[in-house]
Amino acid sequence: LWYFSEGLLGPLFAVFSEQIGGDVLDITAAWATYLIVSGLAYPLVGRVLNHSTWKFRMIAIGYALNTVFTFAYLLVSNTTELLLVQVGLGIAESISTPSWDAFFASKLRDTDDTFAWGIASGHTQFISGVAIAVGGLIAEFVSFRALFLVMGIISLMATIVQVRLSWMEEHAAV
């Protein structure tokens, strides 16, 4: 669900950026900001959570932050606000992804690890591809506002599922 929500925007990000007055440099700055923030925060979060018992919970926390900042797209009216949303999304990504990767890796058997990682990586590409197509239809035939609402709702659903899974994982261990 999370990858579908994120994938809905995809390359439409550039069109949205132009609609709020952005140019090529603004689009570049916004996307670079997201990548740099998440790239710098990944190892920091990984280090902090390395021996934590909260790894699985952090997936839900990252998803919840992602939901907040996805809905924040609805409030964006200029490129400065867009940059702030990108920072928030980068932080959310850096909290949830290393935690998910560590949890996933802990559940793998050595005999299936390469295949399992292939599925984990391949499904994100496939889901994002389908989502981009759907997102394009929503943006073209309805609006970016509708697209951001759909993205936020799907992200919220992913967060709820992850919170439930976190709760089940914690209580199964007891």
Report residues per predicted region.
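Residue-level signature of mid-helix packing/kink "hotspots" within the transmembrane helices
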Residues: 35-43, 128-129
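Loop-to-transmembrane helix entry/capping segments in MFS-fold secondary transporters
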Residues: 24-25, 108-120
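Helix-loop boundary and gating motifs at the non-cytosolic
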Residues: 1-35
